[in-house]
């Protein structure tokens, strides 16, 4: 069997030659032309740059022990490599930028996941991709591509040092198995050694070859297809079904690769190797047509360039190194020509560049892994590798997706291949055809010619052997005897042959029966396939529904993840807002506590001042009491003196009248007629005198009463002052206690509200977490509203309580101010009342003095009138009795003198009383003035104390207001601006009707019972026999059925 394969030729093509060519994507596909899914026209015209990855190996143990200087530094974050070079005692740093940079500490897994994994995914999308390692010998190319030498997995996992090839294989199988795709996979493994291509998967040759000069590994020809592509004729392909099989093939091929020990590498690869994986994946178009998607991955491990003088290569190793350097030099020239857009690119100068032609400037996606050494001893080779790799970045490929093939075209191609193989097998069985490769046939023809010449040379020896003919005749006689024996045996054998013919006839009958049974089985299989096709169609429909459902579930999960992320952000925001609110409330609490302490200090000072003021007022009140007591005593003594004087006047008047009465009675008899009129006048005069005396007594009594009332008013005024002062200070204490209680209530209410807010928030969060799994959509919609409403309510309550407490403080302050103003007004009113009482007392004293003067004047006038009357009576009665007149005159004179003395005593007593009253009033006024002065001083002190208290309370009010405003703004900012709300992305899947097949339709897909199928098949067979009369027509009808009946299984169904 002749197989030919190219590096980038995964698409099979039917051909008339004996063999199957796999050429680059874009060739004809056996008449099954389909639209190729290529990259956009803009990218196709512009091209895609070759991806270049740089990896620096770590220092070896020998380099570490010898303290070899490091001249390479890798910056993986900036994707740069810096090389330090000393020229003419001057340090020069050269920096190279690549697509990816991996330093000495990088892992195999990191390199694969970051750079190679996307390329493997593109292979599964239908692209041709090439990955090859390039660099100096001993820099880790083979380690990067294949790994540390062991591919045994632990618990299904690859070892940590597994390279690109095993990891790519594992990823391909994992993705295909996860997609439940139908696929087939083939691998090839070739080696390029000294410009000769060797198949590493070819079977081992015989130990004793026909031609002695034949080698163990036979070179294979490199052919061109005339369209710019190349392919390798006769390359062995292995069909693989698992990653383990590929690992075995890799181990098998790697064991055949040529390696040798040099001074730079203990196991240096002396050849280039190319491991290719071709994948055919079946997929369905939108019209339900089955297509084959083809992708190919080429994994190239290049031999490293080396300096012969430094590597120690001799003889054959030197020739190997020369061929390696020659091919790599050609690769460098190709890279330079592609970068410089040269008209001629020297692909044909080396087989390596011919094999990599499509990977460099062609239709393949290419990734170059450049490996370097950090040692100063390898600086020249390292700079060369960096220059070539940096130039290779500018190579532009134009990758295209391979054309998809129809399944029917692939099946047709496979049928033609099967027919060709059948013909070869038949020819081999009949031994009448050429069934070996053309090269082997030509080789055997040459061998036959050599043998003919040898026979001619031995013809001369035949005559010499004629002498042996006699001996041979004797042997012939012996053979005749043996022939007779054999004839007898032949008779027996013929008899056995007859028996065998009979058995063969029986076998033919059984064969016919078996053939009819096979036809029955084929009929049953046909019906089973028909049912299977219906089930497959139903399964495709269900798969489409499942994909839609999976997309919906993915959308729902993404929405849930987005909402969880927003909820986490909101939860952290609320926690941060809670801590900020707690800090601000602590600051506010400290401010209020400081203000309360200051208010307590001020109130304590005010209390001390008021205690001193009360003590001074007590002393002043005590002085007033003493002054009033003295005034009362003075007033009582004056009243007593007046009473005694009035009594003396009464007694004198009575004694005088008694004497006059006795004198008059003694003269009554004599003067009764004469003094009738005079007596009446005297009686009238005495009556008027008594009336005036009684009026004077009443006026004195009223004056004393007014004095008592004035003093009582002064005492009541002092008592009212004391009561007002005491009430003022008690009200101040009440207001201070109210302020303290309001502040404490404010603090307690705020703490309680914060605790309630925290409890409500925790309860709300707990309830949401419990209900989140049951009502995700509803809870996410209502969570924000409830939390916002809860926090707004709490903040509103805080605002209202702060406003209420502020208004309470303002009311208390205004109440204290009003009370202070009312105290001032009462104090002024008391001063006015005191002055008014003083003026009334002074007026009363003056009026009493004037009344007493008038009474005295009236008494004097009346006394004068009485004297005149008595003189007139004396003159008129002189004639009546001179002696009586003298006695009466003496009596009257005595009475007048007594009255005058009494009047003088009364005047002196009144003046003395008035003077004492004036003195007492002045003392009382001086004490009142001193008390007023003390009261004014106390009011000034209270005002000086109240003013800073008022200022501090105003500052506390402003600070409290600003703090509350700040808390409100922070809360509003946190809950209105920073609090995230899940905005609809319009990507949530809508409710739709899922088309589920009914149980009846599913039951209709079931294949009928085996007995019923046989019964129907036999009835149709009997009807055909009756119509045609033989079985031949029936067989022709059966052979005319579609090929799917005789060959029911699709050749590309995965059997893993």
Curated annotation (Swiss-Prot):
- Primary location group: cytoplasm
Task: Please state every residue range assigned to the domain named Kinesin motor.
Answer: 49-395
Q: Which residues bind ATP?
A: 135-142
What single Pfam family name could you report for this chain, choosing any that match? Kinesin
Say if the entry is tagged with keyword Ubl conjugation. no
Location in the cell reads: Cytoplasm, Cytoskeleton; Cytoplasm, Cytoskeleton, Spindle
Q: Does this entry carry the keyword Coiled coil?
A: yes
Single Gene Ontology MF annotation:
microtubule binding
Q: Which GO terms describe its biological process?
A: microtubule-based movement; mitotic spindle assembly; spindle elongation
Q: Which InterPro entries would you find in this protein's record?
A: KIF11-like (IPR047149), KIF11-like_kin_motor_dom (IPR047241), Kinesin_motor_CS (IPR019821), Kinesin_motor_dom (IPR001752), Kinesin_motor_dom_sf (IPR036961), P-loop_NTPase (IPR027417)
Which ranges form a coiled coil? 443-525
What GO cellular-component annotations does this UniProt entry give?
cytoplasm; mitotic spindle; spindle microtubule
Stated role:
Responsible for microtubule translocation. May be important for the organization of phragmoplast-specific arrays of microtubules. Plays an essential role in stabilizing the mitotic spindle. Required during mitotic cytokinesis.
Name of the molecule in the record? Kinesin-like protein KIN-5A
**Which gene underlies this protein?**
KIN5A
């Amino acid at each position: 069997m002749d197989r030919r394969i190219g590096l980038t030729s995964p698409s099979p093509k039917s051909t008339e030659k004996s063999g199957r060519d796999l050429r680059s994507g874009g060739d004809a596909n056996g008449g099954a032309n389909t639209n190729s899914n290529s990259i956009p026209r803009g990218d196709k015209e512009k091209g895609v740059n070759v991806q270049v990855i740089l990896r620096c190996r770590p220092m070896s143990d020998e380099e570490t022990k010898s303290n070899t200087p490091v001249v390479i530094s890798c910056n993986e974050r900036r994707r740069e490599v810096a090389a330090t070079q000393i020229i003419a005692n001057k340090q020069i740093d050269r920096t190279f930028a690549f697509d990816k940079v991996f330093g000495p500490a990088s892992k195999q897994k990191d390199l694969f996941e970051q750079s190679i994994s996307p390329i493997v995914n593109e292979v599964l999308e239908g692209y041709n991709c090439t990955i090859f390692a390039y660099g100096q010998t001993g820099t880790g190319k083979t380690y990067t591509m294949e790994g540390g030498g062991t591919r045994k997995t632990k618990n299904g996992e690859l070892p940590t040092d597994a390279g690109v090839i095993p990891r790519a294989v594992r990823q391909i199988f994992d993705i295909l198995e996860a997609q439940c795709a139908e696929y087939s996979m083939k691998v090839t493994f070739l080696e390029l050694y000294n410009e000769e291509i060797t198949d590493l998967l070819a079977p081992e040759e015989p130990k004793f070859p026909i031609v002695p000069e034949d080698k163990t590994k036979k070179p294979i020809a490199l052919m061109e297809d005339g369209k710019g592509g190349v392919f390798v004729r006769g390359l062995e392909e292995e069909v693989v079904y698992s990653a383990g099989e590929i690992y075995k093939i890799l181990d098998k091929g790697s064991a055949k690769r040529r390696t040798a020990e040099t001074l730079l590498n203990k196991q240096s690869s002396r050849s280039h190797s190319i491991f290719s994986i071709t994948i055919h994946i079946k997929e369905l178009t939108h019209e339900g047509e089955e297509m084959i998607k083809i992708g190919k991955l080429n994994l190239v491990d290049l031999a490293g360039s080396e300096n012969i003088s430094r590597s120690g290569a001799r003889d054959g190793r030197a020739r190997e190194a020369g061929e390696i350097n020659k091919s790599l030099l050609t690769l460098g020239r190709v890279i330079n020509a592609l970068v410089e857009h040269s008209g001629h690119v020297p692909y044909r100068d080396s087989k390596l560049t011919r094999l990599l032609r499509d990977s460099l400037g062609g239709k393949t996606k290419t990734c170059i892994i450049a490996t370097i050494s950090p040692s100063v001893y390898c600086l020249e080779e390292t700079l060369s590798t960096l220059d070539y790799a940096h130039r290779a970045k500018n190579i532009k490929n134009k990758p295209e997706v391979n054309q998809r093939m129809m399944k029917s075209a692939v099946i047709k191609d496979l049928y033609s291949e099967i027919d060709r193989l059948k013909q070869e097998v038949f020819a081999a069985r009949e031994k009448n055809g050429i069934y070996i490769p053309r090269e082997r046939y030509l080789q055997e023809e040459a061998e036959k010619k050599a043998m003919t010449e040898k026979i001619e040379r031995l013809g001369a020896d035949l005559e010499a052997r004629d002498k042996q003919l006699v001996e041979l005749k004797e042997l012939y006689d012996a053979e005749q005897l043996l022939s007779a024996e054999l004839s007898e045996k032949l008779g027996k054998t013929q008899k056995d042959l007859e028996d065998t013919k009979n058995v063969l006839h029986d076998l033919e009958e059984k064969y016919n029966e078996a053939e009819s049974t096979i036809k029955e089985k084929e009929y049953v299989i046909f019906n089973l396939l028909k049912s299977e096709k219906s089930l497959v169609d139903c399964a495709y429909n269900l798969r489409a529904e499942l994909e839609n459902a999976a997309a919906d579930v993915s959308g729902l999960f993404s929405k849930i993840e987005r909402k969880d992320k927003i909820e986490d952000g909101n939860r952290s925001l609320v926690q941060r807002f809670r801590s900020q609110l707690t800090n601000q409330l602590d600051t506010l609490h400290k401010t209020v506590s400081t203000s309360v302490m200051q208010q307590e200090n001020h109130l304590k000072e005010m209390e001390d001042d008021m205690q001193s003021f009360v003590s001074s007022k007590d002393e002043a009140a005590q002085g007033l009491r003493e002054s009033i007591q003295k005034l009362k005593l003075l007033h009582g003594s004056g009243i007593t003196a007046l009473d005694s004087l009035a009594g003396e006047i009464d007694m004198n008047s009575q004694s005088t009248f008694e004497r006059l009465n006795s004198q008059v009675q003694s003269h009554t008899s004599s003067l009764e007629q004469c003094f009738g009129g005079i007596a009446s006048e005297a009686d009238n005069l005495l009556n008027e005198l008594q009336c005036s005396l009684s009026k004077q007594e009443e006026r004195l009594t009223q004056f004393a009463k007014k004095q008592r009332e004035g003093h009582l008013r002064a005492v009541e005024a002092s008592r009212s002052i004391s009561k007002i002062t005491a009430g003022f200070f008690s009200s101040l204490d009440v207001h201070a206690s109210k302020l303290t209680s309001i502040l404490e209530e404010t603090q307690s209410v705020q703490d309680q509200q914060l605790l309630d807010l925290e409890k409500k928030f925790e309860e709300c969060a707990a309830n949401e977490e419990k209900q989140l799994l049951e009502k995700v959509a509803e809870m996410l919609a209502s969570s924000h509203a409830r939390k916002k409403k809860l926090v707004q309510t709490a903040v509103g309550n805080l605002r209202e309580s702060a406003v209420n407490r502020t208004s309470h403080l303002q009311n208390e302050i205004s109440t204290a101010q009003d009370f202070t103003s009312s105290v001032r007004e009462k104090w002024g009113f008391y001063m006015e009342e005191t002055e008014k009482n003083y003026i009334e007392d002074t007026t009363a004293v003056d009026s009493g003095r004037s009344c007493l003067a008038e009474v005295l004047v009236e008494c004097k006038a009346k006394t004068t009138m009485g004297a005149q009357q008595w003189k007139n009576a004396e003159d008129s009665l002189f004639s009546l009795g001179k002696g009586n007149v003298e006695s009466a005159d003496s009596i009257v004179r005595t009475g007048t003198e007594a009255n005058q003395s009494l009047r003088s005593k009364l005047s002196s007593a009144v003046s003395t009383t008035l003077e004492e009253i004036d003195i007492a009033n002045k003392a009382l006024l001086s004490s009142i003035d001193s008390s007023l002065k003390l009261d004014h001083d106390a009011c000034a002190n209270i005002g000086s104390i109240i003013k800073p208290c008022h200022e501090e309370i105003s500052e506390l009010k402003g600070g409290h207001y600003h703090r509350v405003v700040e808390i409100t703004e922070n809360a509003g900012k946190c809950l209105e601006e920073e609090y995230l709300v899940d905005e609809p992305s319009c990507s949530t899947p809508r409710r739709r009707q899922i088309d589920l097949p009914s149980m009846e339709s599913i039951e209709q897909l079931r294949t009928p019972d085996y007995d019923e199928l046989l019964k129907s098949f036999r009835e149709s067979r009997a009807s055909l026999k009756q119509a045609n009369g033989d079985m031949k027509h029936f067989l022709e009808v059966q052979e005319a059925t579609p090929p799917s009946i005789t060959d029911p299984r699709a050749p590309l169904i995965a059997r893993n």
